[in-house]
Regions:
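Acyl-donor-binding surface of acyltransferase catalytic domains
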Residues: 59, 66-69, 74-145, 291
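Conserved acetyl-CoA-binding loop-helix of GNAT-fold acetyltransferases
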Residues: 78-92, 230-235, 239-256, 274-279
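Active-site rim helix/loop that mediates acceptor-substrate recognition in acyltransferases
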Residues: 19-62, 172-201, 208
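Conserved beta-strand in the GNAT
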Residues: 50-52, 57-69, 198, 206-216, ...
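C-terminal "cap" of GNAT-fold acetyltransferases
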Residues: 128-156, 260, 265-271, 280-297
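Short amphipathic alpha-helix that is part of the acyltransferase structural core
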Residues: 1-38, 52, 141-175
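Hydrophobic adenine-recognition pocket in adenosine-nucleotide-binding enzymes
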Residues: 7, 72, 231-233, 266
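Conserved beta-strand-loop-alpha-helix junction that forms the acyl-donor binding cleft
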Residues: 77, 102-112, 235, 264-274, ...
Length: 297
């Protein structure tokens, strides 16, 4: 029997197996298996956002639109599971009210052919940029009228959501923030408040105007890699050099913790951010295309 149903916590091991087998056949460029499997945490935290495909009692595929993912086990492809999962993804995206469905699709091969046949359209790409180890980045300096401090988990959650919502309101790809998601991130065992930096008005530590989060990977990674995960500045405080200084803080932070390489991802349509990162010495190393499908109709 071939069927679809909502994801449950009990499906996590089977979905991980699908992730592993799909990754072995060809995962996203410059993404490690450990990073790919990190999607399990989000699935377990939000099972209502995902669906699985079944053959009999076996999970052979899954989709998690919030993470732009749809994967089918390589041995069970070309049996209609992808098409059914795409329908489920479309319904999940419509229910979430987040606009058109977006999925990561490889640049070529059967994944792209599937997307085209399903009526999806290429929208844009995220570029993975990497800072070469030999590149010298200046130390961050203060911006006039602005001070910085670490985040206070619990105490800053609502203010950070408001800041990020306003800072990314004009972002080319919709970004959604909530107090619940922020609290979940802060509750993870690997969360360190020192990895996040809040920029605020110098005379008011509660008036937040910018944000940066930068982390390092597992100590077992060789070489140890840093990741500037997010840089955001309120529109009214842009063009003062604050984004550049927050970026430089992130680079300095992960290098102080031993990172040899520093990565960040940027939406190709975010031209001003892309210019900044390239000017600071980052170079493109991978492309992650995103394709869309309207959820209405």
């Amino acid at each position: 029997m071939i069927a679809l149903r909502p994801f449950t916590h009990a499906d996590a091991p089977a979905v991980e197996a699908v992730m592993r087998r799909s990754f072995a056949l060809g995962g996203p460029e410059a993404v490690t298996l450990a990073e790919h499997l990190g999607g399990i945490d989000d699935l377990v935290a939000h099972p209502e956002e995902a669906a699985v495909a079944l053959e009999g009692d076996m999970v052979v595929g899954y989709t998690h639109p919030a993470a732009v993912r749809l994967e089918v086990d390589p041995d069970h492809r070309r049996r209609g599971h992808g098409r059914r999962l795409l329908g489920a993804a479309r319904r999940l995206a419509a229910g979430a009210g987040d606009g058109p469905l977006e999925l990561w699709v490889p640049r070529d091969g059967p994944g792209r052919a599937f997307a085209e046949a399903a009526g999806m359209r290429y929208r844009s790409s995220f570029h993975l940029l990497r800072l070469p180890r030999e590149t010298v980045v200046p130390e961050p300096v203060d911006v006039a009228g602005i001070a910085c401090r670490p985040i206070r988990p619990g105490g800053d959650d609502a203010a950070v959501v408001a800041l990020l919502t306003d800072a990314f309101a004009d972002h080319p790809s919709p970004m959604h923030f909530s107090v619940e998601r922020i609290a979940e991130a802060h509750a993870r065992p690997d969360f360190d408040p020192e990895d996040a930096r809040l920029a605020h008005a110098a005379d008011d530590p509660h008036q937040l105007v910018g944000f940066c989060r930068a982390t390092t990977g597992s100590a077992s990674d060789t070489p140890l890699r840093g990741d500037v995960r997010l840089v955001g500045v309120l529109p009214a405080f842009r063009r003062r050099g604050l984004g550049r200084e927050l970026l430089r803080w992130g680079v300095a932070h992960v290098r102080e913790r031993g990172a040899v390489e520093v990565d960040l991802a940027v939406e190709a349509l975010n031209a001003s951010a892309l210019r900044l990162y390239l000017a600071e010495g980052f170079a493109p190393v991978a492309e992650w295309p995103r394709w869309t499908l309207e959820t209405a109709g």
